[in-house]
Structures are given as structure tokens and as C-alpha cells.
Amino acid sequence: IRPAPGLWWCRTHAMLPTPERLGGSLVRIWWGGRNDANQSHIGWSLIDLERPDVVLETALDPELAPGRLGTFDDNGVLPSCVIHSGSETRLYYIGFKPGGTTRMDLFGGLAIKPDGAAAFERYSEAPIIERCKVNPFINTAPFVVKTPVGWRMYYVAGVEWVHRDLPRYNIQIASSKDGLNWQRKGRVAIDFEPGENAL
């Protein structure tokens, strides 16, 4: 999988490949490409695990584009997790927005596509993991697991900005009853080793 100068949404970059099993040996790889304005969009490529070095198809247009001006993802989106739930597919993603005193803001979003629908729609124009008392900095890259007793999210949680270009973050855990509304208590899944800034 690589950028495609002939496709407007992915002229440069091929970021955060995120797999979705389709059945048999077919896998859809969701990934982020950048347009001429350096804004990331989410599209996909199709591969067969029996010939993983051959790309069978790549989306001609993105499945998810940056959000409306002023929203948390107005300057770019990247995939972080795709999960099937009942009769719908959920695309959990990273939203980018230029910062002010810091280089950027990063928060986690969700888009949903019901079976048979033509396109994903945002669950909300707001992040599903926004700033809160226990997470006052960046909260992004949600990776979601559905368990017999509920939903669990592993996500990137900022703990400080070392300077305007360098956030410091670890991996924390959130819980949910429906995969939509999340409870966070600052529970750390993977913490820093001495000298580390980012996980």
C-alpha cells in the first residue's frame, strides 16, 4: 500500500494501516492519505492474505474526509480501529486540528455505517473522548474491543506538553456499555519507562 499521486485524497503518505477482516483470506486495510493541502483522509485498499504483496483495489474516493470548519477533525482524519457491531460497522478514528499554544489537538472520533448504507456518517461532530478532569490534554487513537461484559477502549492519553511541539502521552483504558459513551478514570494500560515521552 502506498500513496497514489493520481488519486486526489492520497497523493502523499500511507498512514496507520488498520485491518478489517471480510471473510476468507480477504482483508480491507483502512489507511490515511494526504491531499494537496496536506490534510489526511481515510480510504482503503483490498488485499488477499494469500498474496499480501498485491493490492487488489484501492478506494477512488475517501470514506471519511475532514470535518466542518471549527470541529475537532477539520484538518484531518486517520483510522485507528474498525469493528462490526450488530448490523453496522464502526470506524473509530483520530481527528486533527491545528493548535494555538501547542502544535495540534488530537481527539478520538467515531463514524458509523449501517449494513447496506452507501457511506459512513459521523456519530457526532464532537469527539467521543474529549478533554475531561482526568484527561485534560490530547485523547486519541481509540482502539476498541467488544467483550462479553461491555466495551473496552485503549487510547492515547496526554499527560502534559513538554513544549509546543512535543506531547507526552501513555496508553489508558476507558469502558462503555454501548461503545458510544465512555467512562474514564485515568486507568493506565501501558506506562512510561524511564526516559520515555510517548507510547
Regions from the PLM with identified roles:
Residues I1-N75, I83-A141, V145-L199:
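Beta-rich carbohydrate-recognition and catalytic domains
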Residues P79:
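Short, solvent-exposed interaction modules
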